[in-house]
């Protein structure tokens, strides 16, 4: 049966609970334990699938089709354990489940209340698969004191009481602000945060304190005294140049040992950290640098493309180069020449997105990459924009566009080279959708197989003619234009197993120009870079030697 580690946060949000959880998971794995990480979000959305990228950042998609918080991406990248639908829950989903049960009569006419019905639903979620792993790490979103988080804090309090003594511990992440005028780290915000936590029945076993530098012994002892934790369980989380140094940094601070001590596990297996030492070496000792432009519409918030940025970093590690990402707003050249904005880059990446805004700029980015022989990777919408560019400027379909944009305009303006996908095959059954369906959870989501053309660039990159990748889209390139586009040199080199849905396109007369309908960034890891990103950065490295 699993031991449970509950990770909470205080003082301010966005301190890095997800990264701390992921790094701890990696350290426990390095000692030979199996782990699973979960995220419990107090917001009332059922999932983040319909939330604005500016509001929430990236939506991370799992193999089984869940739309989840970007922290699950950190969990996967650090541990290599594929996340599942049962690893992410929100207040919205919890309340939906409770109300559905009430409507079915499952509660036998009782009055439905936060305690016990909502808290029981949360506890049931936490318990899923507890016999499968050695450690279950559960991160509670938000900060202590948030009203919407109270049912979750009460649920984990009850959960820890339901389990045998010593089976649950609590790790609290806080901020130690540094006051330059006095040259001091201030512990009072952390003390008050722990006081708030204790007032709702939770006592932290471990304090992880974010700070700009080391925590002096005096401050550690003060925190230990007033927060009622052991001094060696006060862990410094200093600012790092790379998130992938976090496992090594936390190990140096003794986080993994503090966790094992809290559970009374002794003697504990020694960790094997060779993988993370190699990752750190590749990050901090590159042999060159490449410049990659990400041409998108959410570039003001880099978290909107979190997995893409990390996958490029992984590709850089594999090629021993630093990838310098520059964020380019596609709207800047919607109506003008893209050359001044894109010249000098060693590669161009156009990511996914929704809506018409910025799409003309993305089409011009694809055109620039094609005409100037710059390596190009188009992901999801980025592939669709590359196809539309080819249709307009090479195949002679001047009005080529997407049905998505006609839908927004309310009238037909384009020839729909990209159309609204209403039917597809998932496993052994057909999935049907209509324009009247809810927006949430109705896209083509999760892992799907694709068959690659033998001898194609992508087959060479993957080293296989069969792949499985994660998807998140409701629009698709129309197969009826395949012959016309292939006659111009844009080959459809990846298809769904039934041959109906284009998955990959590539220009045969270009050094490296690939568009994919799926999201390869979601499966990339620092110790196992995705083949597409690995080869994309290699192509950028080759280009950098020519300019």
From Swiss-Prot:
Its EC number is 6.3.4.2. CDD domains: CTPS_N, GATase1_CTP_Synthase. SUPFAM superfamilies: Class I glutamine amidotransferase-like, P-loop containing nucleoside triphosphate hydrolases. Keywords: ATP-binding, Glutamine amidotransferase, Ligase, Magnesium, Metal-binding, Nucleotide-binding, Pyrimidine biosynthesis. ATP binds at residues 14-19, 71. Residues 291-546 form the Glutamine amidotransferase type-1 domain. GO terms for biological process: 'de novo' CTP biosynthetic process; pyrimidine nucleobase biosynthetic process. Residues 1-265 are annotated as: Amidoligase domain. Mg(2+) binds at residues 71, 139. Homotetramer. This is CTP synthase.
